[in-house]
A protein has these predicted regions:
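Active-site loop-to-helix "anion-binding N-cap" substructures in soluble metabolic enzymes
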Residues: 1-160, 164-179, 186-187, 191-194, ...
């Protein structure tokens, strides 16, 4: 069986980690994640030496090598639940997204050491734009992704993962929703909820790496059966342990 991943590299790697018997293709091998590139396995190993005994909580938006150096993975949806279930008093090192880590720390009341990574796309979402849009659309609800800066999160009615934003868009009684996440998400929201108006906080919130995946290179990838993403077995097993721990705990 073949999996063609229309996303970025860490997503294809995660598919390879979980499904080693399947051929995983990424139509453009240059479709990486800038945030995932802000941390290396060697850098994380050094940080672990600086903080002995710390539990490493790794956002799923990271490379296979970084996952392999971590104790447990998390998503934006379950990060708080994962952290809450760690033993009280345990030192926590959260990588690589400082803003998801900050939001998770605020929600759980747990102090954490935060790796200084971030999503460039979500940092283009500014609080001043939300303030302006709320003035223009006073009845609108504001929903943002937890990869946004704290001052943006403070202005939101809801802070949700991508899946959570979809569910909120369907369930809310509001007819206007101001959305703070990657702008491609709005296409799906509008398609699924044609009776509602979805307003992007910023037209600049575009992930250029994701946009490298096109219908043309998906077709090419299927025809040529490449480029294949295959995580080396030694790394795969260690990374899978962190993912399995997330599924067990979260």
């Amino acid at each position: 069986m073949v999996i063609v991943f229309c996303g970025v590299l860490f997503m294809a790697e995660t598919a390879s980690i979980l499904c080693p018997d399947k051929k995983v293709l990424l139509p453009d091998i240059h479709a990486g994640c800038p945030m995932a590139d802000m941390i290396t396995a060697e850098g994380l190993r050094q940080k672990k030496i600086e903080h002995p005994g710390a539990t490493v909580v790794c956002y799923i938006n990271s490379s296979a090598e970084v996952k392999a150096e971590s104790d447990v993975c998390c998503t934006s949806a379950n990060a708080a639940n994962i952290v809450e279930k760690l033993p009280e008093g345990r030192k926590i090192l959260f990588v690589p997204d400082q803003y998801l880590g900050h939001y998770t720390s605020t929600r759980t009341g747990r102090e954490m050491i935060l790796w200084p990574g971030f999503c460039p796309t979500h940092t283009r979402i500014k609080s001043r734009d939300i303030i302006r849009l709320k003035q223009e659309h006073p009845q609108a609800k504001v929903v943002v992704h937890p990869e946004c800066r704290p001052e943006v999160i403070a202005l939101a009615d809801e802070v949700l993962s991508t899946g959570g934003i979809r569910r909120f868009a369907s369930s809310t009684t509001a007819t206007e929703v101001i959305v703070g996440t990657e702008i491609g998400m709005l296409h799906r929201l509008r398609k699924e909820n044609p009776d509602k108006s979805f307003i992007p906080v910023s037209e600049q919130a575009v992930c250029p790496r994701m946009k490298l995946i096109t219908l043309e290179n998906v077709l090419w990838s299927l025809e040529e059966m490449e480029p294949e993403v295959k995580v080396p077995e030694e790394i795969r097993l260690r990374a899978k342990a962190a993912v399995d721990k997330m599924l067990e705990v979260g």
